[in-house]
């Protein structure tokens, strides 16, 4: 299981990303529309002044139950080994084990 501080840090990043999402998106659209290079640099400076953790690329998907950052299935929000355990225990309706 991931440390609680790492999970809290990820939650903080999610809040920052939601807070600055509209500002970041509007600035990027503005850069593509402005023809002069000096204006683009000004807008780019505004983007750089935003907090680094507000960028969506810095977010990780984490397992809902363990907080594991790797091997996550988006549909379930779980990591692979937890998903497998839950399917074997019949906690996920409709999911079947593969057999061939």
Swiss-Prot record:
Q: Does the keyword RNA-binding apply?
A: yes
Places the protein is found: Plastid, Chloroplast
**Superkingdom of this protein's organism:** Eukaryota
| A GO CC term attached to the entry | chloroplast
The record's annotation in InterPro entries points to:
Ribosomal_uS14 (IPR001209), Ribosomal_uS14_bac/plastid (IPR023036), Ribosomal_uS14_CS (IPR018271)
Q: What GO biological process term is on the record, naming one?
A: translation
SUPFAM superfamilies in the record:
Glucocorticoid receptor-like (DNA-binding domain)
Query: One MF term from GO for this chain?
Result: rRNA binding
Give the PROSITE patterns listed for this entry: RIBOSOMAL_S14 (PS00527)
Alphabetized UniProt keyword annotations: Chloroplast, Plastid, Ribonucleoprotein, Ribosomal protein, RNA-binding, rRNA-binding
Task: Quote the Pfam families the UniProt record gives.
Answer: Ribosomal_S14
Q: Which Gene3D superfamilies match?
A: 1.10.287.1480
Q: Is Plastid a UniProt keyword of this protein?
A: yes
Family, as annotated: Belongs to the universal ribosomal protein uS14 family.
Record's subunit section: Part of the 30S ribosomal subunit.
Family annotation (HAMAP family): Ribosomal_uS14_1
Per the entry, what this protein does is: Binds 16S rRNA, required for the assembly of 30S particles.
Task: Report what the protein is called.
Answer: Small ribosomal subunit protein uS14c
């Amino acid at each position: 299981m991931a440390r609680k501080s790492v999970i809290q840090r990820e939650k903080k990043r999610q809040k920052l990303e939601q807070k600055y999402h509209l500002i970041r998106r509007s600035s990027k659209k503005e850069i593509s529309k402005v023809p002069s290079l000096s204006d683009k640099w000004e807008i780019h400076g505004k983007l750089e002044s935003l907090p680094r953790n507000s960028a969506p690329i810095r977010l990780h998907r984490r397992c809902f139950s363990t907080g594991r950052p790797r091997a996550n299935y988006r549909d379930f929000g779980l990591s692979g080994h937890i998903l497998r355990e839950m399917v074997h225990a019949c906690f996920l309706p409709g999911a079947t084990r593969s057999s061939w």
